[in-house]
A protein has these predicted regions:
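Large eukaryotic, non-enzymatic subunits of multiprotein complexes that serve as scaffolds/tethers
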Residues: 1-325
Length: 325
C-alpha cells in the first residue's frame, strides 16, 4: 500500500506491506475526534483527521493521522468504537456534514458519529426480509446497495438516521453499483447505475422510486443518436468483459457514465441529462489494462478526475471537451 498526497507534484507520504487487501477508502473527517491507538498516540487537536479504511479478507483495518501534519506523517492503526472491524468493508464514505461516516459490510449499513465514534443508526437486510449485502455505493447522504444479489435498496442519511426510501428486485445478479451525482456537490444523484453479472448491461434506475429510466441501448450505437438509455449493452464477449465497476460523473461540462470491465477495458458514454431523461450522445471504448478495472472519482485543483485502477493505472480528466488519460 502506497499513500500519496497530490499538490504541486505527487508526494509519497508512506508505504506499508499489507496482505489480503480487498478495498480501501480515504476519509477526511472535518470534526475533531479522539482516537484510541494500538500503535501510537494521535494528537486530538482541531486538525482534520484522515482515516484510511482498509478492507481485508476477514476484517477491517483503520489507519489514521492528522492533517496538516507537515512533512512528517505519523500513521497509526486505530481502534474506533462504532466501526464493524470484525468483517470486511464493502464501502465507506462521509455524509454531507463531513461529521458522520457511513460504513457498509455484508451484514449492515452503519451511520457513525465521528464525535465520540458512536453508532447513530443501523440498517440491516432483515428489515426487508433478506440476508446479505453484496455491493454498495456511498455518496454523501445517498446510499445504494444490492441485497442478496438482485434487490436494489436506496437509503438516505436524514438527521442522524438511515431512511430506507425504496427497493426493487431486478432480473439479473448485480456486479457493481454507483450513486454518485452528475451534479457533483451541487446536487444529489438522480439515478443509480447498476452493472449486471449475467448480461453485459449497465442499467439506470431513476431515484427515488428506482424505476427503470428507459429501454436498452446497443453498445454499437452510432455517435449522435439521442435515445433514452437505461440499460446500456456492453456486448456479450465472455466473463472477463463483464462490468466490474460503474461510475456516473461529469468531466468538464459533460455528464458521463463510465463502465470498467473485467478485461481492463473502459466504456465511456457521454450523456445528455435533462428534464426529459437521459440520452447517449457518444460512446467509445478504450483498453486501460488487462485485469478488472476499478473507477474512483477525486477532485484535483477544483476539477473532478477519475482514477482508473487495473494492472496498469490511469487518471481520466477533461481536455478540450473530451476525456483524456
Amino acid at each position: 500500500l502506497r499513500v500519496v498526497r497530490n499538490g504541486i507534484g505527487i508526494e509519497q507520504l508512506f508505504s506499508v506491506d499489507i496482505s489480503g487487501l480487498l478495498g480501501l477508502w480515504s476519509l477526511t473527517v472535518a470534526q475533531p475526534a479522539s482516537c484510541d491507538s494500538r500503535a501510537m498516540d494521535i494528537d486530538t487537536d482541531d486538525a482534520r483527521l484522515v482515516l484510511l479504511v482498509l478492507s481485508l479478507v476477514d476484517r477491517t483495518l483503520l489507519l489514521g493521522w492528522r492533517e496538516p501534519s507537515g512533512e512528517q506523517v505519523d500513521v497509526a492503526e486505530v481502534a474506533l468504537s462504532g466501526w464493524r472491524l470484525g468483517e470486511p468493508t464493502l464501502a465507506a464514505g462521509l455524509a454531507s456534514d463531513r461529521r458522520h461516516v457511513v460504513q457498509a459490510t455484508s451484514s449492515a449499513i452503519v451511520l457513525i458519529d465521528s464525535v465520540g465514534w458512536t453508532v447513530q443508526a443501523e440498517w440491516v437486510p432483515g428489515e426487508i426480509g433478506m440476508s446479505a449485502i453484496s455491493a454498495v455505493s456511498v455518496s454523501g447522504d445517498q446510499v445504494a446497495a444490492a441485497i442478496d444479489g438482485r434487490t436494489i435498496v436506496y437509503l438516505e442519511v436524514r438527521q442522524g438516521a438511515l431512511a430506507c426510501v425504496g427497493h426493487r428486485q431486478l432480473d439479473n445478479v448485480v456486479s457493481c453499483i454507483d450513486v454518485h451525482s452528475w451534479h457533483g456537490v451541487a446536487g444529489p444523484a438522480t439515478h443509480v447505475a447498476v452493472g449486471m453479472w449475467s448480461v453485459n448491461d449497465v442499467c439506470l434506475l431513476a431515484l427515488p422510486d428506482l424505476v427503470t429510466a428507459a429501454p436498452a441501448l446497443s453498445l454499437r450505437m452510432s455517435q449522435g443518436l439521442a435515445l433514452p438509455a437505461s440499460a446500456i449493452n456492453l456486448a456479450s464477449t465472455g466473463q472477463d468483459s463483464l462490468p466490474r465497476s460503474v461510475l456516473m460523473c461529469t468531466l468538464g461540462n459533460t455528464p458521463y457514465l463510465l463502465a470498467g470491465l473485467g478485461d481492463g477495458r473502459l466504456h465511456q458514454f457521454a450523456l445528455s441529462v435533462d428534464a426529459d431523461g437521459v440520452s447517449v450522445r457518444e460512446h467509445k471504448s478504450i483498453a486501460l489494462g488487462s485485469g478488472p478495472l476499478g473507477l474512483t472519482p477525486f477532485v484535483n485543483h477544483g476539477s473532478l478526475n477519475v482514477f482508473a485502477s487495473s494492472d496498469h493505472s490511469a487518471v481520466l480528466f477533461a481536455d478540450k471537451h473530451q476525456t483524456a488519460h
